[in-house]
Swiss-Prot record:
EC number(s) reported in the record: 3.1.1.-
Active-site residues from the entry: S165, D262, H292
InterPro entries to which the protein is assigned, alphabetical: AB_hydrolase_3, AB_hydrolase_fold, Acetyl_esterase, GDXG_lipolytic_enzyme, Lipase_GDXG_put_SER_AS
SUPFAM superfamilies xref list: alpha/beta-Hydrolases
Protein name as catalogued: Acetyl esterase
One Gene Ontology MF term: carboxylic ester hydrolase activity
Family named by the database record: Belongs to the 'GDXG' lipolytic enzyme family.
Keyword presence, Hydrolase: yes
Length: 323
């Protein structure tokens, strides 16, 4: 699609989102478009420092968890001494960027709003690690904490998964992997998904939206996919194209959030409509005037904080509902 035919989203954003787009951090250099992947990872970490400031204070603990691929770093956020549930968080970043620090504020806010222990998983990034390594690392982390619950004062009977963008795909894929492989790590009471991609190769929203402002042009999306997958056959895997999985049964309750001007919004719409058609518990909410990745900007956007609180409320409601 010619760029001229796309929706001019920058003229339609909310005032809050526009303020974020126009905000310039003092002393921040330009994005290293021609830099190698490690340079881009370091820039992303630097750029996110401002957005992670002034986060709630709470007890945190870092733990290296053994997996078949080696140790994976996790960070436990404990807002209170005892927890009624665990929420595992998978960060976004197109499978190639991000870590526990780039999403620290998001995890702290989720821990505060749910009152539960949030465990961030620093899964191995692509292209150094290819599908399905990040999923298998996540499953290994869940298995580890289910076996060492007393050591960490965890309640592993009720667990959930959460993630943004690529992390949302990993969150849902990991829950389906546990179901499909009959791996018991606790009762998955909910999955919180913010503006994820779930397997569509093309869509109306991918044609109408996406540009330099969000890093989600068609070329960008192709690059992320090629970095993550081993080969073209993986495109149809039921833990990458989640619409090729069985979404008609035993899908944990899903909170599905989308951004109005996100090229990935049709992934969320299709996921919601599929689950709803098959009586799988789910809730869908679109946040008007927003771009992909708006969850990061709660320092300037009340709607970002609203989206986190909406997900937290969904999770807490499922904590009280026998399943």
């Amino acid at each position: 699609m010619k760029p001229e035919n796309k929706i001019p989203v920058l003229t339609r954003l909310s005032d809050e989102m526009t303020a974020v787009v126009n905000f310039q951090q003092p002393g921040l250099p330009p994005w290293p478009a021609d830099g190698d992947i490690e340079t881009q990872r370091q820039y992303y970490l630097l750029e996110r420092r401002f957005w992670n400031a002034d986060a709630p204070s709470m007890t945190t603990r870092t733990c290296a968890v053994p997996t078949p691929y080696g140790d994976v770093t996790t960070r436990l956020y404990s807002p209170q001494p005892t927890s009624q549930a665990i929420l595992y968080y998978l960060h976004g970043g197109g499978f190639i960027l991000g870590n526990l620090d780039t999403h620290d504020r998001i995890m702290r806010l989720l821990a505060r709003y749910t009152g539960c222990t949030v465990i961030g998983i620093d899964y191995s990034l692509s292209p150094q690690a290819r599908y399905p390594q990040a999923i298998e690392e996540t499953v290994a982390v869940c298995s580890y904490f289910s076996q060492h619950a007393d050591e960490y004062s965890l309640n592993v009977e009720k667990i959930g998964f959460a993630g943004d963008s690529a992390g949302a795909m990993l969150a849902l894929a990991s829950a389906l992997w546990l179901r499909d492989k009959h791996i018991r790590c606790g009762n998955v009471i909910a999955i919180l998904l913010w503006y994820g991609l779930y397997g569509l190769q093309d869509s109306v929203s991918r044609r109408l939206f996406g540009g330099a402002w969000d890093g989600l042009t068609r070329e960008d999306l192709d690059m992320y996919e090629k970095a993550y997958l081993r080969n073209e056959d993986d495109r149809e895997s039921p833990w990458y194209c989640l619409f090729n999985n069985d979404l008609t049964r035993d899908v944990p309750p899903c909170f599905i959030a989308s951004a109005e001007f996100d090229p990935l919004i049709d992934d969320s719409r299709l996921l919601h409509q599929t689950l709803q058609a098959h009586q799988q518990p789910c809730e869908y909410k679109m946040y008007p005037g927003t771009l992909h990745a708006f969850l990061h900007y709660s320092r300037m956007m009340t709607i970002a904080d609203d989206a986190l609180q909406d997900g937290a409320r969904f999770f807490m409601a499922r904590m009280k509902t026998p399943r």
